[in-house]
From Swiss-Prot:
Protein name: Tryptophan synthase alpha chain
Family per record: Belongs to the TrpA family.
Lineage: Bacteria, Pseudomonadati, Pseudomonadota, Gammaproteobacteria, Enterobacterales
GO cellular-component term (any): cytosol
Presence of the UniProt keyword Lyase in the record: yes
Active site, UniProt feature: 49 (proton acceptor), 60 (proton acceptor)
The EC number(s) this enzyme carries: 4.2.1.20
Gene: trpA
C-alpha cells in the first residue's frame, strides 16, 4: 500500500503525473505477458494495473474482453496469475502493482484468503469493479487486514455523499472515471472533471488517477491539468497487443513507444 504514497510523492517532487498502463495477465501467453510488462516499464510506466482473466467482465468493452479470451485460450488460471505477480514484484520491488478484477474471483477461495494471497505476492491494491463502495465492507476490511489498498471508482456523476464515502474508505489511489459505460479507447474520455478532483481533495481522498478512454498524450495532459495525479490507459495498450499478435518484437517496441509518449505527457 505504501508504494503508492512513495510513488506519488516522488512524482510530485519532479512535477510529474503518473502513467499507469493496464493489461490482462497472461495475454496473449504467460511468457509474452511478462515481456509486455517489461516493455511498458521500459517506456516509463510508474505503476501497473493488472487484470486476472474473467469470463464475464461487465465493465469492459470488446478490446479487453478479447484479452481475457486470449489468456483463457493460453490456459491461464488465477493461480498462474499469482505466480506471475510474484515474479513481477521480484523484478520491480518499488513499483505499485494493482489488480482490477471482479467479485466472483475474490469470492472463489474466500475473501480473506484472496487478500492474504495478494499480500503474499506483493500486490499493493485491488479494485473490485462490480462492488460499489456501499457494498464493499467485507472486501475493504479484508484488504486493510492484509495491507492491501481498497480502490474505489468515482463516477463522473458522483454526488457529495458518494464522494465522501469514497474518500473515507479508499486508499492508494482513487479511480476517476472519465465517463459512464464500459472501458475502451473507441469512446473518448470526456473532460473536464476538475470539480470532482477538487471535491476529492477537499475530502482527503487518495490521489485521483483518471481512466476509461485514455488513448493519447493530450488526454493525459488534460487529466493532469484538471488536477488528477495521473492517468490509466488500458484498451489503447491492449489494442497494440491485439494488432501485433503475429509479430511480438514489433508489439514490444510499439508498447514501449506508446508508454513513452503517454509518460512524456505527464511531464509537461
Amino acid at each position: 500500500m505504501e508504494r503508492y504514497d512513495l510513488c506519488f510523492k516522488r512524482l510530485a517532487e519532479k512535477q510529474e503525473g503518473a502513467f499507469v498502463p493496464f493489461v490482462t495477465l497472461g495475454d496473449p501467453t504467460p511468457e509474452l505477458s511478462l515481456q509486455i510488462i517489461d516493455a511498458l516499464v521500459a517506456g516509463g510506466a510508474d505503476a501497473l494495473e493488472l487484470g486476472i482473466p474473467f469470463s464475464d467482465p461487465l465493465a469492459d468493452g470488446p478490446t479487453i474482453q478479447n484479452a481475457n479470451l486470449r489468456a483463457f485460450a493460453a490456459g491461464v488460471t488465477p493461480e498462474h496469475c499469482f505466480d506471475m505477480l510474484a515474479a513481477i514484484r521480484q523484478k520491480y520491488p518499488d513499483m505499485p502493482i494493482g489488480l482490477l478484477m471482479y467479485a466472483n474471483l475474490v469470492f472463489s477461495n474466500g475473501i480473506d484468503s484472496f487478500y492474504a494471497r495478494c499480500q503474499q505476492v506483493g500486490v499493493d491494491s485491488v479494485l473490485v469493479a462490480d462492488v460499489p463502495v456501499e457494498e464493499s465492507a467485507p472486501f475493504r476490511q479484508a484488504a486493510m487486514r492484509h495491507n492491501v489498498a481498497p480502490i474505489f471508482i468515482c463516477p463522473p456523476n458522483a454526488g457529495d455523499d458518494l464522494l465522501r464515502e469514497i474518500s473515507s474508505h479508499g486508499r492508494g489511489y482513487t479511480y476517476l472515471l472519465s465517463r459512464a459505460g464500459v472501458t475502451g479507447s473507441e469512446t473518448r474520455a470526456s473532460l473536464p472533471l476538475k470539480h470532482l478532483v477538487d471535491k476529492l481533495r477537499e475530502y482527503h481522498a487518495a490521489p485521483a488517477l483518471q481512466g476509461f478512454g485514455i488513448s493519447e498524450a493530450s488526454q493525459v495532459q488534460q487529466a493532469i491539468s484538471a488536477g488528477a495525479a495521473g492517468a490509466i490507459s488500458g484498451s489503447a495498450v491492449v489494442r497494440i497487443i491485439e494488432k501485433h499478435l503475429n509479430d511480438p518484437a514489433l508489439m514490444l517496441s510499439e508498447l514501449t513507444a506508446f508508454a513513452a509518449s503517454l509518460k512524456a505527457a505527464t511531464r509537461s
